[in-house]
Amino acid sequence: MRPSAIARFSSRRVERTACLAAGVFLLASGFIASALAQSAQQSQPDSGQNSQNSAQNPAQTPQKPAPVTTTVIVHGEVEDNYLPESITVGTLGGVPLKDAPLSASVMTRDLMSDQVSRLLSDVVKNDASVDDDYVPVGYYGVYEIRGFPIDLATGLEVNGLPIAGEQDVPLENKEAVEILKGIASVESGVANAGGLIDYVTKRPANIHAVDLATDQRGTAFGAADFGQLFGSQKQVGARFNLAGERIVPYMNSTNGWRAVGAGAADWKLSPKAVLRGDFEYQHKTERDGSGYQLLGGTTLPDINHIYRSTMLGDQPWGPPDTYDTFNTSARFNYALSPNWTAFAAAGLSHSLIQDNVLYVYGCYYEAECNSGAAPPYFFAPDGTYDIYDYRDPGELRIDGQAEAMLSGHIRTGVITQDVTAGGVLFLRTVHQPGAPPGDAPSTVQDGAVYSYVGSANIYQPIAALPPPGDPDSLEYPLQSAGPRALWEDDHQASAVIEDRVRIPGRIQLIAGGRYDSLRDHNYSLTATSPSTPPKISDKNPWLPQYAVTFDPKRSLTLYANYGVLLSLGPEGPFWVDNSSQFLAPFFTRQAEIGAKYEPSGRILLTTALFHMRAPFFYPKVIEAPDSFCPESVFVAPGDLCFQQEGRETHNGIELNAAGKAANWLRLNASATAMSAMSTDTGTPAFDNRQVINVPRLHSNVFADLTVPGVRGLHLMPGWSYTSRKEATRDDAVSVPSYNLLNLGARYTPGGEQGRVTFHIYANNVTNKKYWSDTGASYGDTFIWLGAPATVRLDAHYSF
């Protein structure tokens, strides 16, 4: 947790854009249809375009869809395109992606390899509905889907089980990354709206491969992928992934390194029973950089006079962050009969962080800000900012989940039903530094260390500051954090049920829901002020989810869905009267209609129209005590109080194309046009305004083009466009729109069946300088410079 979130230590014309996006999509669809027609006229079978993934897994054959799952899962082979040929994605029972009544995208292993992806931020850029929210260099990221930040407690999964999202999940052992866009109340229970991101691990196969990679800055990467199938019927398999990396980012002084170890095992105990297990561990150490803030809360820094390579507040004595994380799970599938199956699964996720950063924030120690002439929670008007020694040792977050499901197929005349029911138990705990004991020395702080050590200016060189503990330092004597204490204890017990009814006329009706018994104990205030009682959220909501699908023909699916989701209330920032207090849980509702078209079995075209509504939260100027800031916390008229008032409504259209458009073209394209408006907020300046950090239009295209006449050579151009993003709630300040061009190539000497494959991929080839994001974190807003041109090289060898 970063200090801006911590109160106690002292101190965020859709019609035209939709038409434009639709026009782009129609043009792309026309081009794809033309390419498909040309491909269909060719008499030769497509035998020379096997993907890298197929070369890596010669003995692996497409598997049957996994049985019932409580989360949206995608499993299967990737053969010759960016769309898995055999996949399951759905509500509780799992259905083919084309038939699923929801909006989802899949980033395959081929796509990740072609783009030389290392982090989730490299992957999610392929979906226009996903944006960065708070993603510092060297720190784990927070992302938003459809304009809503994901919940790090439950919004990230591995093989359908939630993990502690405060980590950079390694990609070396991942077969795919799936993104579910929109509400998934049956799957996720109590969480934030927007969607889920799920990592699918590689399964055992006969494979022996190594990778070596670098970039123009000197990053060094190596990985090994070893797998083997055993037994007369190959009923037992194991796979191991090892990786190490010396990390050299574009920002000075943020170098680091990481090591990864992962294993997976499958055991077919009998024709009816299968046991699967996974484990992954990563150790990472790296310094991270802070983002910029608006000058005086009203002005963007002059982008022509700042540098992407500058680490704000950099000092040679600044320690790095250290991460030790593991995720493990097991799953047992059993076929009770030809029509009935059951499974049980359990997972545990552990994230331990030694959080150390030279944190750059606000201008509390500048005269202009202290006088009230400028808000102290932004940079000063002249670009001056405060530097804090922030140390939060022993941040420990644990997620655990166990679930069991029973699924059956029932036929009654012309009506068939797929019924699924089961239960889920979820636990999350958070430990961080708390209040010192009564006999502790005065150097032990209440919670994390958050000490002012000096100031600097974004337009000037950073002066050297004495390290904490030095007699000349503003932090003398050296401070230490309080002992680790329990901050959050979240228990959920859920009963889930779903019935998918197929009736004549190619119509399917789906009704389901999740009864969730939530008991969330938040001790964040108690941990640092023991006399303060914990914040307890005790809810027992019924979270319904309904859908209908209609298939006019085999290749086309039309659908509609409706769902409700419960989320825990946000925490007030430290500079409001009700600082660090959590607001009440709230509901988000969604209605969505969509269409999916798969004309050839090799490419999927989808579109979705969605409407989502949630409460609006913001710091409001108040003149007298109210229900959010009663007499006990109200300080003075004109103060700010963090409140829930009004609502934000997100309406949008999503367009996607993924797969193989022709023998010479693989494609992954996405466009999202969205209006995310705040209304009835009680502050007229904030009404009918676009929500912070949500672009009205976002699009991207990535293509893999076979070069004629050069066997094994492919060119991979890419382009993305992001419209302007608002940086203030009144939309008075925004960052400009930008285009980015990417370019890559893949070469396999001797053709696609060769053992060696070389990749080169360059992001932002024009080295464009731009503001990428304006995300809000715990009520504070930050602006981030986009990354400069980065060229990555990778060599893959199979043996």
Where do the model's predicted regions map?
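N-terminal Sec signal peptide and the immediately downstream disordered periplasmic leader
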Residues: M1-Q115, S121-S129
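Conserved C-terminal beta-signal and adjacent last beta-strands/turns
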Residues: G23, E395, S407, V419, ...
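Acidic, small-polar-rich N-terminal luminal/periplasmic segments of exported/outer-membrane proteins
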Residues: T69-I207, I593
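Outer-membrane beta-barrel translocator/receptor signature
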Residues: N173-E175, V186-G263, W267-V274, I603
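Acidic/polar loop-and-plug regions of large Gram-negative outer-membrane beta-barrel proteins
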Residues: E245-P249, A262-K268, K272-A335, N339, ...
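Structural signature of Gram-negative outer-membrane beta-barrels, strongest in the C-terminal barrel
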Residues: D266-K268, R397, T416-R428, A435, ...
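Membrane-embedded beta-barrel scaffold of Gram-negative outer-membrane proteins
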Residues: A335, T341-G347, S351-V357, D551, ...
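Gram-negative outer-membrane beta-barrel transporters
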Residues: P504-L509, H611-R613, D639-T728, H796-S798
